[in-house]
């Protein structure tokens, strides 16, 4: 009890918290300054590993999450590939990482990670589909695969199962052009602009019949399992409803992203 009282007095005297004492009814925590509290646990800023913001959904997510940390120094490290984001998180380079639920479930089989925030379906991407040249969806022999994308690897394995289909390593952002050139027959891709497919002579087939395809659309935030201050900070500052509303305003064009 003595240590607890001493800690509370230190926090109170620094202005990090305000306690209201009510005699026999006890004492109540009535105000907290999260920015000031962070200094007491040696956290001067928060850095989140985030996908490259090449879609409005990603921009809205980045902008909405940053807005929740108002008053707290919060920064992004944008990088492609969930594997590298999680590796940097585990190595202590960053404090948290945004990945899909599908990727997160594969990483959580390892030790050292905590699923700290879940945002629901279609908060990470809209929908993945199988892209191929028109009329050739039944003739796929070579499928493109970016080995840095945990989602694409898992979904490709789920969709093609034990089929005799060759996996061809390529960059995710080159996928459509590689199909057009005939280097590969198909790729699993997050379709953002349907008109782009039409112009390229490609068609999209929705992925269904497996819950993992839906998991790939959900954004989650991972922390290190022993980073209790960061987990508590997320619980304290993030209003999920406000974050998602912010994301949708960015997607619809009502609000410019800021991240």
What does each model-identified segment do?
Residues 1-84, 93, 213-215, 227-259:
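N-terminal hydrophobic or amphipathic helices and topogenic motifs
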Residues 112-117, 161-168, 201-207:
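Active-site regions of enzymes building and remodeling cell-envelope glycoconjugates
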Residues 98-111, 177-206:
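A ligand-binding cleft/hinge motif common to bilobed small-molecule-binding domains
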Residues 33, 118-133, 199-235, 239:
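Periplasmic-binding protein-like
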Residues 102-104, 120-123, 170-172, 191-194, ...:
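Short, acidic/turn-prone active-site loops that include or flank metal/cofactor-
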Residues 143-145, 188, 219-222:
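Short, hydrophobic/proline-enriched secondary-structure or compact coil segments at domain edges
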Residues 52-157:
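Mid-protein regulatory/catalytic core that forms ligand/cofactor-binding pockets
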Residues 76-87, 166-180:
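Short helix-initiation/N-cap motifs at beta->coil->alpha
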């Amino acid at each position: 009890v003595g240590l607890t009282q001493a800690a509370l007095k230190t926090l109170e005297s620094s202005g990090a918290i305000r306690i209201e004492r009510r005699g026999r009814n006890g004492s109540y925590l009535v105000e907290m300054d999260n920015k000031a509290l962070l200094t007491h646990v040696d956290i001067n800023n928060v850095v989140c590993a985030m996908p490259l913001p090449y879609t409005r959904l990603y921009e809205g997510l980045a902008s909405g999450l940053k807005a929740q940390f108002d008053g707290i120094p919060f920064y992004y490290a944008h990088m492609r590939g969930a594997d590298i984001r999680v590796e940097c998180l585990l190595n202590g380079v960053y404090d948290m990482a945004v990945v899909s639920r599908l990727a997160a479930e594969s990483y959580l089989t390892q030790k050292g990670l905590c699923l700290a925030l879940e945002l629901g379906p279609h908060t990470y991407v809209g929908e993945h589909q199988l892209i191929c040249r028109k009329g050739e969806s039944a003739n796929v022999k070579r499928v493109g695969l970016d080995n840095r994308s945990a989602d694409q690897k898992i979904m490709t394995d789920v969709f093609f199962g034990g089929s005799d289909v060759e996996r061809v390593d390529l960059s995710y952002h080159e996928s459509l052009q590689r199909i057009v050139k005939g280097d590969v027959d198909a790729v699993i891709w997050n379709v953002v602009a349907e008109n782009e497919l039409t112009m390229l002579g490609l068609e999209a087939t929705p992925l269904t019949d497996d819950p993992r395809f839906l998991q790939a659309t959900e954004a989650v935030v991972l922390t290190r399992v022993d980073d209790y201050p960061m987990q508590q900070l997320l619980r304290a500052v993030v209003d999920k409803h406000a974050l998602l509303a912010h994301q949708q305003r960015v997607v619809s064009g009502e609000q410019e992203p800021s991240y």
